[in-house]
Regions:
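Acyl activation and transfer enzymes in specialized metabolism, enriched
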Residues: 1-27, 171
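Acyl-thioester-dependent acyl-group transfer interface
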Residues: 23-171
Length: 171
């Protein structure tokens, strides 16, 4: 209801709220860098797939505080704009095509798998350095009605090294 009042999705609202919450806890030294979240994106909603394998990507919305406009509404508007620009089918397809181009590169195609795996790990670590935390909105969880009365909460276990907040809706 609160997110609707602001004219944004729950994911946009929660992302902006988490960015602001992290900023409130930052030291003066940390404030020099932007707060950047890694937000997983379920690609099945954009590219229908029958595969049971994980089919996701991620976006990295963020905000650089200290440039004058630091209210929640400012962060919310910037986050909304980021989601609109980066969650289009075209933008995600472009990103996926760039990753596929690396995979099909003539020289990289012939590189030993062990070398490729090391390079991928290094690249992931470099990209991850800028990320402050991870926010996973698992969306609505549906359970059979006969089980619903017994459910008080859901637990989620993740394997990220960063601070991660996982949220879901139920009921």
């Amino acid at each position: 209801e609160v997110s609707r009042k602001h004219g944004v999705s729950m994911s946009v609202f929660l992302t902006a709220a988490m960015i602001c919450a992290i900023h409130e806890e930052q030291s003066k030294m940390q404030e020099k860098k932007p707060v950047i979240l890694m937000v997983p994106v379920n690609l099945r909603k954009i590219f229908p797939s029958d595969s049971m394998l994980n089919f996701f990507s991620y976006i990295e919305p963020g905000y650089h505080f200290g440039e004058g406009k630091d209210s929640f509404d400012d962060v919310l508007e910037a986050t909304k704009q980021y989601f609109e620009e980066n969650l289009s089918k075209e933008k995600i397809a472009e990103r996926m095509n760039n990753l596929i181009a690396y995979e099909k590169h003539k020289i990289l195609k012939w590189a030993p798998l062990e070398l490729k795996n090391r390079c991928i790990k290094m690249g992931a670590k470099l990209a991850e350095r800028e990320v402050t935390a991870v926010l996973s909105n698992m969306s609505v969880v549906k359970m059979p009605p006969e089980y619903a009365k017994y459910i008080e909460r859901f637990g989620v276990y993740t394997s990220t090294m960063r601070t991660e907040l996982c949220v879901c809706s139920f009921g």
